[in-house]
């Protein structure tokens, strides 16, 4: 009889694995098929965003935020613009606020659609992503009509948004909403109620609410464990106070609850979008989309060609940029992945002294070992999918 002790063996999951959600490398220590330890290796997409921002003006820094969570770009721009506006002490006009909320909810649907359908693909269902991508395509066309770009929109500006949306675009977004709710019902029937999907996700990746707070979780992760915590309700920003929507909350804190919550959040986002479309179409929703302060927001092209002062403002704004009063501020928004925060320190110049980005996915990924321990190897990709991680924001 062989007396050699049985030892654990280590395998690499990624960094080019199709279920790794980007450039993630996990070193898994296995005892047979049971996971004993998970060691996430990050940094393969590190671009030094926070340091690069210190050498550029505030306006030049906005596009960097599109490249963090590149699945829902405008939500990140929102946090950065809110932080700058807080330091400058300026208020965004009502129409600008409504447009921001509208595009942030479109970003939420873009993110959740990708996540829930690819989660189904990770556990073996190949049809949902095809249905989901069809709807995402329509939303990306809206992005393109508003900003000229399908993904890296660069649409939000300190003080408002870059340009107004034509009424036809607002109407088309409104017309998209109701048919999409039918697609949500179809997706629900297709895989949320599917018994194989349930077997692969129910009671997998369970985490208690207490542990959620300890690990610094936010967003869907804490709502899946039973906390009705949503920054849009808890600390309302822009015009979210006017919006009527519910916060879906789970009970068990497992993969399945998190996916059901994302499905319901898409319905709630559609509800908010319909309210925004209605308000934007009313007389009270008309008006400027950015603050009239030309030290921060450029004058219109027509004005610039007639007025010398407007030309000077434009020239100064795009050569030197605007100066932000010295101080420090933290602004968090309810991004699709969780609380996306920007801690901005200004030294009174035209460039940020320091900009610390709080990426929600970073805290979620750090708990991979805690969530996967004693799970089966096949459950690792299901747990990873339920965390909804994008490496643009984790590695920055």
UniProtKB/Swiss-Prot annotation:
GO terms for molecular function: NAD binding; NADH:ubiquinone reductase (non-electrogenic) activity; quinone binding. It comes from the Bacteria. Transmembrane segments: none annotated. Its EC number is 7.1.1.-. Keywords: Cell inner membrane, Cell membrane, Membrane, NAD, Quinone, Translocase, Transport, Ubiquinone. InterPro entries: NADH_Q_OxRdtase_suD (IPR001135), NADH_UbQ_OxRdtase_49kDa_CS (IPR014029), NDH1_su_D/H (IPR022885), NiFe-Hase_large (IPR029014). HAMAP family: NDH1_NuoD (MF_01358). It is found in: Cell inner membrane. SUPFAM superfamilies: HydB/Nqo4-like. Belongs to the complex I 49 kDa subunit family. It catalyses: a quinone + NADH + 5 H(+)(in) = a quinol + NAD(+) + 4 H(+)(out). It comes from Beijerinckia indica subsp. indica (strain ATCC 9039 / DSM 1715 / NCIMB 8712). It is a peripheral membrane protein. This is NADH-quinone oxidoreductase subunit D 1. NDH-1 shuttles electrons from NADH, via FMN and iron-sulfur (Fe-S) centers, to quinones in the respiratory chain. The immediate electron acceptor for the enzyme in this species is believed to be ubiquinone. Couples the redox reaction to proton translocation (for every two electrons transferred, four hydrogen ions are translocated across the cytoplasmic membrane), and thus conserves the redox energy in a proton gradient. NDH-1 is composed of 14 different subunits. Subunits NuoB, C, D, E, F, and G constitute the peripheral sector of the complex. GO terms for cellular component: plasma membrane.
């Amino acid at each position: 009889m062989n007396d050699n002790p049985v030892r654990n063996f280590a395998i690499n999951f990624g960094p080019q694995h199709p279920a790794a959600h980007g450039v993630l490398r996990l070193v898994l220590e296995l005892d047979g098929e049971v996971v004993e330890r998970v060691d996430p290796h990050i940094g393969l997409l590190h671009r030094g965003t926070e340091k690069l921002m210190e050498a550029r003006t505030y306006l030049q820094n906005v596009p960097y935020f599109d490249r963090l969570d590149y699945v829902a770009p405008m939500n990140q721009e929102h946090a950065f613009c809110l932080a700058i506006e807080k330091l400058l002490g300026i208020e965004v006009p009502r129409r600008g606020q409504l447009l921001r909320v509208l595009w942030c909810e479109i970003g939420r649907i873009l993110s959740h659609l990708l996540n829930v359908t690819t989660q189904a693909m990770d556990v073996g269902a190949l049809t949902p992503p095809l249905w989901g991508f069809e709807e995402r395509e329509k939303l990306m066309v809206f992005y393109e009509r508003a900003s000229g770009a399908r993904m890296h929109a660069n649409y939000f500006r300190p003080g408002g948004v870059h340009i107004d949306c034509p009424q036809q675009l607002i109407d088309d977004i409104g017309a998209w909403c109701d048919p999409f709710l039918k697609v949500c019902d179809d997706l629900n029937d297709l895989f949320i109620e599917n018994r194989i999907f349930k077997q692969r996700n129910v009671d997998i990746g369970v985490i208690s609410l207490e542990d959620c707070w300890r690990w610094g979780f936010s967003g869907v992760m804490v709502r899946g464990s039973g906390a009705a915590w949503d920054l849009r309700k808890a600390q309302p920003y822009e015009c979210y106070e006017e919006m009527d929507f519910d916060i879906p909350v789970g009970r068990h804190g497992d993969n399945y609850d998190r996916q059901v919550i994302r499905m319901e959040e898409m319905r709630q986002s559609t509800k908010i979008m319909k309210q925004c479309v209605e308000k934007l179409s009313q007389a009270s929703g008309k008006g400027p989309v950015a603050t009239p302060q030309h030290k921060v927001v450029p004058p219109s092209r027509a004005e610039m060609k007639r007025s010398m002062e407007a030309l000077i403002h434009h020239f100064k704004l795009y050569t030197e940029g605007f100066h932000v009063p010295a101080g420090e501020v933290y602004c968090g928004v309810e991004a699709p992945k969780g609380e996306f925060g920007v801690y901005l320190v200004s030294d009174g110049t035209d460039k940020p002294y320091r900009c610390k980005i709080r990426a929600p996915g970073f805290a979620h990924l750090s708990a991979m070992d805690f969530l996967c321990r004693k799970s089966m190897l096949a459950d690792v990709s299901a747990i990873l999918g339920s965390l909804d991680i994008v490496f643009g924001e984790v590695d920055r």
